[in-house]
Amino acid sequence: VKKLMDNVTRKAEDRGKIRTLGGRACHFDLWQPVQFGIFKPLPLEEARDEYDEPLKRAFTYKALNKLIQGSAADMTKKSMVALYKEGIIPHIQIHDEVDISTESPKQVENIIEIMESAVKLEVPNKVDHEEGDNWGKIK
């Protein structure tokens, strides 16, 4: 994980952006002084005018989180599109959870298969599910 974090942070610092698994760009467009202190991150030209010292990109420490959370969002969205194409319409999606009414255990299995295969990864993506009479009764 440390190696991945260092690699992603370095890309954010060097390129000013990283890409999620779905290809969306997460930008790091603000700059701040290299020296530790309380500085307001600014666009590059403003930072050059404001701070008379070497600059670095701001918030690159958030790159790994943006990669993970952004990729999870991409995967959830692809899963929802795949479900929709099969005529399965989720009621609500919150973060990485999807609420769906089902008619049978076979349909539950089908939904899990669709969601697990929506994004091809080297390590298989597993979908957990919980069932209940209504959303409020699921623990």
Language-model features: locations:
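Conserved catalytic core of nucleotide polymerization and phosphodiester-bond processing enzymes
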Residues: 1-139
